[in-house]
Regions:
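Short intrinsically disordered, low-complexity coil segments enriched in acidic
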Residues: 1-8, 66, 76-78, 87, ...
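A generic structural signal for short, solvent-exposed coil/turn residues
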Residues: 2, 15, 85, 139-141, ...
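Beta-strand->loop->alpha-helix junctions that form or flank phosphate-binding loops
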Residues: 56-58, 68-86, 109, 134-138, ...
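Nucleotide phosphate-binding/pyrophosphate-handling subdomain across enzymes
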Residues: 102-179
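Pocket-edge structural micro-motifs
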Residues: 25, 57-58, 73, 84-85, ...
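Acidic-glycine-rich active-site phosphate/pyrophosphate-binding loop
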Residues: 79-100, 143-151
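Short secondary-structure boundary/capping segments
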Residues: 12-14, 46-48, 83, 147-150, ...
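Flexible active-site lid/hinge loop adjacent to a nucleotide/diphosphate
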Residues: 1-71, 78, 100-107
């Protein structure tokens, strides 16, 4: 099973055991509930209690720098893709499209790219071929309320992004629409 957990859920979970856990981001979110960024970060990192493999966005290396962690991400300055702490020269990006072994996967926005790279990291851990994974992702559509195209008319596009409930997620959605 694949489960997405919020800091609210992680805060009260007793058994957090899993085979693989992924941490995509840590932002100063929900401080009204958690009071400090340090407490919020500690709760989010609780996802790694009693787990097999830890996969973390490379942008979080400053918070979690450990030998038992596998990092993923895209380093824009050098156009480097990292999957499970290894540079992947056979994966590259050109014009908001991820390319691998003759397969081209379009994506909308940096946050979507981060999600794709997290998926590829899990697939790599499970020894599932990237080509199969990317081919499957080509048929993926955004879930309802997440940058969901509602209507296009007279060169105007209307999107529903009501799942963006904080400034960071709204900013990410707006940036992806500008691309």
């Amino acid at each position: 099973a694949i489960v997405e957990l919020s800091s609210y859920q992680l805060e009260y979970m007793v058994d957090k055991s899993s085979d693989i856990s992924i941490l995509l981001n840590i932002t100063d979110d929900h401080l009204d509930r958690h009071e400090t960024f340090e407490r919020y970060s500690k709760i989010k990192m609780g996802i790694f209690d009693n787990i097999g493999k830890k996969i973390i966005n490379i942008s979080l290396k400053k918070y979690i720098n450990s030998d038992d962690v596998k990092y993923f991400g895209y380093i824009q300055d050098t156009s480097t893709i990292i999957i499970n702490s290894e540079k992947k020269d056979n994966l590259y990006i050109n014009n908001d499209t991820l390319h691998y072994d003759g397969i081209s996967l379009n994506f909308m926005g940096y946050h979507t790219l981060q999600n794709i790279l997290a998926v590829l990291s899990v697939m790599d851990c499970l020894k599932i071929n990237f080509a199969k994974c990317l081919t499957a992702l080509m048929s993926f559509t955004h879930p309802p309320h997440r940058i969901e195209l509602v209507k296009r008319s007279n060169n105007i596009s209307w999107y529903n992004d009501s799942k963006s409930t904080n400034c960071d997620s709204t900013d990410g959605a707006l940036k992806s629409l500008r691309q």
